[in-house]
Amino acid sequence: MDRQGRTTCRWCARTVGQWTCPECGGHALRMAAVGSTRTGEELGRAFPGIPVVVSGAREAHGVVDEVDGSPRLVVSTPGAEPVAEGGYRAVLLLDGGVLSSRPDLGAAGEALRQWTNAAVLAAPSARVILLGRPDPVVAQALVRWDHAGFARRELIERAELHLPPAWRVARLDGPVRGVESLLAQAEADGFEVLGPVAPPPVHGQVAPGGARALVRAPLTRGRALANMLGVRLRDRSARREEPVRVEMDPTRLW
């Protein structure tokens, strides 16, 4: 959604017309996250006369390294937070649900890392407020400052689900026949196989004849999995067959 309220599909670039919610029949749309520039503009209107500093790689002036101790509002993208002289008097962490619930394997840990990096910039007596319906497990880890406990729980869950870093996982993308050939070899070698399934759409279109699959191995067999896939891919290249892309331990599985 742009500043004029026009909504465009991120996949096919088509403008969305009169949209209706199938549940409530409503027509209003709201951004899940408005971005640092828009947030800075809205805060400037809400607090006239108060300086607003926006820091981010996409800003015209780029990332602001530090600010002095005079009263001001600072809006920053994750990783671009300026250091404030004496620390910030308050820190608001916005869009907690958007950041901690992304469909990536490491979304929760990345959210905790970014929130922590911002929280440590606060003054000793300052409040840190997390907004936006964050994942409760990640939020509690931040509240209790229990990063080690969070990491232990994550590792236990990953081990139960046979996911990295407790297991090695290879994601295969390519033509159906090529992916199925690699899966057959993986199964013959005793590795776990998931799929194949249709690949995710690109610009609203699913590539015909494409497939995606996962091959999993315990850490003790991780090198064997990588070696097997490397040999098979070199064989396919030598025979000039359609390439299959292999990514080890991807953050996005499907």
Predicted regions: what is each one?
Residues 166-168, 208-213, 242:
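Residues at beta-strand starts and edge strands
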Residues 198-231:
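Short, intrinsically disordered low-complexity segments
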Residues 191-197, 231-254:
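Conserved short beta-strand edge segments in small beta-sheet-based binding/regulatory domains
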Residues 51-53, 186-203:
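Short secondary-structure junctions
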Residues 42, 158-164, 194-207:
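Short, flexible, solvent-exposed loop/turn segments with mixed acidic/basic and small polar residues
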Residues 136-139, 179-181, 222-225:
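Short, charged/polar "capping" segments at the starts of alpha-helices
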Residues 182-190, 224-237:
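Short amphipathic alpha-helices in soluble, non-transmembrane regions
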Residues 1-173, 177, 187, 215, ...:
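Inter-lobe coupling/hinge segments of SF2-like helicase ATPases
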